[in-house]
Amino acid sequence: MDVKEIDKYIKRYILAPYRLRILEARQDYDLAIKGKCSKKSIDEINSLYDYIEKIESIINSDDLKKIEIFRLDNKTVLEEYNMTKHQAWNYRKRVRSKILEAINAGELSELK
């Protein structure tokens, strides 16, 4: 699995929920433009975009790219990488802890 594939899986499992929030916020934004919604939705959209950019910059850091697996399908992990379910789970935890470190360091204050 190359770096692009690793990034794809990281984005799917970590970023996807926030992208969904952006889609919902965009719908509110359309209403706001028509005068049917508050400015709060517009501010939320902007903060979500900023948040995703920050997350992506953390995900693209070299130390995360050195880890060779983020495909979390257990059978594939076992067959292609000889990783157990437990090892794959530990990798997931490492990625999430890296993001939590960034949140705690104030780099991602939106989620604090």
Which sequence ranges carry the predicted segments?
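DNA major-groove recognition helices of helix-turn-helix
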Residues: 88-106
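N-terminal interaction/assembly modules
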Residues: 1-58, 107-112
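Short amphipathic alpha helix immediately N-terminal
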Residues: 57-76
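Helix-turn-helix DNA-binding module
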Residues: 72-87
